Amino acid sequence: MSNNYTADNIDALEGMEAIRMRPGMYLGSTDTRGLHHCVWEILDNSVDEAKAGHCTEINTILHKDGKVTISDNGRGIPIDEHKKYPGKSALEVVLTVPHAGGKFNGNSYKTSGGLHGVGSTVVNATSTYLHAEVIRDKKLHSLTFVNGGEVTGPLEVSNYKGPKKSGTSITWMSDQNIVTGKQIGRAHV
């Protein structure tokens, strides 16, 4: 260790890199409690839709392989291009840019839970896999991420003929090298 302490010694982490380097800061813990916190962050988004009167159904699936899926019949995360991030859908921005969300100005939600624009990004940053599906305007919009938020391709759009008019589904697998909790307790969800 050197006595020479200069600007060269100061790191400035940004975006998802900071989350992956210090996940406990965002999850409170990296053990089973952190794993549960990831579930609550995604679940809070669906609950916010319900509290705002836009959602009547929320489903949580704990898969045997450790993945988690939370889906709702809310409005669906916006999928149009974000004005501040040309070429990126609002869905990609919400899942990859800390402090991006619809809960800051009070126009979309009167009350909300979670980390207010950080939660979905934190879940993605601490996952080996995350797949998002949004149903809007009779279209299914899909986006997949790997290795802590690397998008695997462009937003995929296909016709949707299912029963839902709109909604969001998020499926992810937490990175066991970051969030070391082994099993999600059903009682905690």
Label the model's feature ranges.
Residues 57-64:
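Short beta-strand/loop element within the Bergerat-fold HATPase_c
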Residues 51, 61, 161-163:
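Sterically constrained small-residue positions within well-ordered secondary structures
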Residues 27, 31-35, 50, 107-110, ...:
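Short, surface-exposed helix-loop/turn micro-motifs enriched in polar/charged residues
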Residues 1-43, 92-95:
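Bergerat-fold GHKL ATPase/HATPase_c domain
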Residues 1-8, 66-90, 101-186:
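GHKL-type ATPase core
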Residues 18-21, 25, 48, 52, ...:
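Conserved helix-loop functional segments at active or binding sites
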Residues 33-57, 119-126:
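Conserved ATP-binding N-box helix of the HATPase_c
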